[in-house]
A protein has these predicted regions:
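A helix-centric hydrophobic-segment signal that preferentially recognizes long
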Residues: 1-141
């Protein structure tokens, strides 16, 4: 074999090694991105489940408070609208925005509760408040 042929074979071998290495890196990065994407989807699914649980607890909580604070109708309407927005939200951004509305409405409801000491001693209210607080903690994590 001539020196020229050996040089061509060496160059081809080096190019093939570079191509194989680059392809291997591409496959590795793609697999990593796919697995990270799946992890994000799974995490968002868990958030979605907790948001749904929270939305399911709110009507009972509101009904308990309504019995004591019937004059606070606007707050109950705000909570109903915010809950409806959360349940009908499609994208994560819409759910985050609706959750913010619901947080604000629930905050106003909890301020109302402070004006009714007899409500704070109601067993059903306390249980629902504990469940809601536990759900809020799961959302925060």
């Amino acid at each position: 074999m001539g020196k020229g042929l050996i040089a061509v074979v060496v160059v081809i071998a080096i190019v093939l090694l570079i191509v194989l290495f680059t392809f291997g890196q591409y496959v590795s990065v793609k697999n990593t991105l796919v697995s990270k994407n799946e992890a994000v989807k799974a995490a968002w699914s868990q958030v979605d489940i907790v948001l749904q649980r929270r939305a399911d607890l709110i009507p009972n909580f509101v009904e308990t408070v309504k019995g004591y604070a019937q004059q606070e109708v606007t707050v109950f309407g705000d909570i109903a609208k915010a809950r409806s927005a959360l349940l009908s939200a499609g994208s994560p951004q819409e759910k985050i925005a609706a959750n913010g509305q619901l947080d604000g409405a629930l905050g106003r409801l909890l301020l109302i509760v402070e004006n009714y000491p007899q409500l704070k001693s109601n067993e059903n209210f306390l249980r629902l408040q504990d469940e809601l607080a536990g759900t809020e903690n799961r959302i925060a994590v």
